[in-house]
Structures are given as C-alpha cells and as structure tokens.
C-alpha cells in the first residue's frame, strides 16, 4: 500500500496541475471531432515536418502522397491517434493520474530509444495543434485546455528523454 501512496505522490508531482473536469471535457469534445481522421492527422504532421517522417523506417525517403493511402500508413496513424485517445479518455479524473503518467512515461522512453529529440516532440505538437485549429471549433477556451493537456503530457514524456 505504501508503494501506491509513493507512486501517487510522484504522479501528482510530475503532473503538478492536472486537467480540471471542464478542461478534460473540452479536450475530449474537440478530439472526438477529429479522432477518426487518423491518416489525415499523421499526413499533416509529416507534411509540416518531413524530419519526423524520416524517423519512421517504413516511410523514410518516400513521397508522402505515395504512402498516405497505404495500409501501413493507416495502421501507424491509428496507433498514434489511439494513444492520444486513450490518454484523453483517462484525463480529468484524479484516480487515473497514475495510468496517464505510466502511458506518457512509456511514450517518452520508447521515443528516446528511437532517437527522437525534444525538438521533434515540439514539432509534432505544433503540427497537431495546427491540425486541430483547422478542423475543430477552436477558441481561447479550447486553446487553453489543449495547451494545458499538452504541457502536462510533454513535461512527463520529455523527462524520459533526459
């Protein structure tokens, strides 16, 4: 039991300012508008930042138009979007903080092993936010909720890159 108490304190420390229920609802609602556009989301990231595409061995050096409609691209896009969907679905509930922390920490560890830099995480964030701004109802409240969510996510993931 002591272990879980210590783990909970570590999670709260790492995610010092978890999303409120209202912020989580805003993020979930906006994500629900695009989460089935997996291929378009990943294509937007690759189009904006070809250096990210180059980190994927199965897509490196290939023309985006030639891979966008392939099963491999759709499968990988679905994996990425599903990760976000899982984290978002757990957000806004204090009882889920340790699960969110574990998922996001593993994301950082896995990407460190692949040589992904903090700058590339930042590029992905920029491309994702640009996609969201263009495809969901976007206002100051949505921007603030997403920034809070991504700040928390990146604080944990980037700690694993150190």
Swiss-Prot record:
GO cellular component labels:
extracellular region; hemoglobin complex
Does this entry carry the keyword Heme?
yes
Q: List the disulfide bonds.
A: none
Q: Cite the entry's keywords alphabetically.
A: Heme, Iron, Metal-binding, Oxygen transport, Signal, Transport
Signal peptide positions are 1-16
Residue ranges annotated for the Globin domain, each copy included: 18-162
Which residue ranges traverse the bilayer?
none
Question: Which superkingdom, per the lineage?
Answer: Eukaryota
Which GO molecular function annotation, any one, does this entry have? metal ion binding
Sites where the protein binds heme b:
76, 111
InterPro entries found in the cross-reference section: Erythrocruorin, Globin, Globin-like_sf, Globin/Proto, Mb-like_M
- Is Repeat included in the keywords of this UniProt record? no
The record's annotation in PANTHER family points to: GLOBIN-LIKE PROTEIN
Miscellaneous remark of the record: There are at least 12 different components in Midge globin. There are at least nine genes for VIIB variants.
Query: How does the record describe its quaternary structure?
Result: Homodimer.
Which family does the entry's similarity section mention?
Answer: Belongs to the globin family.
What is this protein identified as?
Globin CTT-VIIB-7
């Amino acid at each position: 039991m002591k272990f879980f108490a210590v783990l909970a304190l570590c999670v709260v420390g790492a995610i010092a300012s978890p999303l409120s229920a209202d912020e989580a609802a805003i993020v979930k609602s906006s994500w629900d508008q695009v989460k089935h556009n997996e291929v378009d989301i990943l294509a937007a990231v690759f189009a904006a930042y070809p250096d990210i595409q180059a980190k994927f061995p199965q897509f490196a050096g290939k023309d985006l138009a030639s891979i966008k409609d392939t099963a491999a691209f759709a499968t990988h896009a679905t994996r990425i979007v599903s990760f976000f969907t899982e984290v978002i679905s757990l957000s806004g509930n204090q009882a889920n903080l340790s699960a969110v922390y574990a998922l996001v920490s593993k994301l950082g560890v896995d990407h460190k092993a692949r040589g992904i830099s903090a700058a590339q995480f930042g590029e992905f964030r920029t491309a994702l936010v640009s996609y969201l701004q263009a495809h969901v109802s976007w206002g100051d409240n949505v921007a603030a909720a997403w920034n809070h969510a991504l700040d928390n996510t990146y604080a944990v993931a980037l700690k694993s890159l150190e």
